[in-house]
Design a protein with these regions (language model features):
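Conserved catalytic cores of phosphodiester-cleaving nucleases, focusing on short active-site segments
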Residues: 52-67, 77
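Short, charged, amphipathic alpha-helix that recurs within catalytic cores of restriction-modification
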Residues: 70-91, 95
């Protein structure tokens, strides 16, 4: 039961952060039916997953938001970005927006992966879209 409660708490925190993101940016969450997809080399329909999309200076921008930074999560999002840029052949930007890049008083180290155009906290993203 403790594990389930912990997962529910993380899910609730993530949903709350998505709501805050929408409130402060005015960008609404994407619906699954509107997300791009392609047929991969194995003949399987593959969805390119992200949370939000907007345009900045005429460029389509895809955003994934999360409460904490983890390198494995960035790897997943970098893969999505590469698929969007290479398989769907779309000129676009991909950003990962984190609630805070400081955890337990220490700044998180971010190594940007191929496909990603930026990993930043919400305040830096707000400055980007101004």
């Amino acid at each position: 039961m403790e594990h389930q409660s912990s997962n529910q708490s993380r899910s609730r925190n993530g949903n709350d952060f998505e709501k805050v993101f929408t409130e402060v940016t005015g960008i609404t969450k994407m619906k699954k039916k509107d997300k791009p997809s392609f047929i991969n080399s194995h003949g399987i329909h593959q969805l390119i997953d992200f949370d939000f999309t907007t345009e900045i200076n005429g460029t389509k921008v895809y955003i994934d938001v999360t409460t904490t930074y983890r390198s494995d999560r960035q790897k997943q999002k970098a893969y999505n970005a590469l698929m969007m840029k290479n398989k769907v052949n779309m000129d676009c930007k991909f950003y990962m927006v984190i609630k805070s890049l400081v955890e337990n008083g220490k700044p998180k180290t971010v190594n940007l992966l191929e496909g990603m155009d930026g990993v930043m906290d919400i305040n830096d993203f707000i400055n980007l879209i101004k």
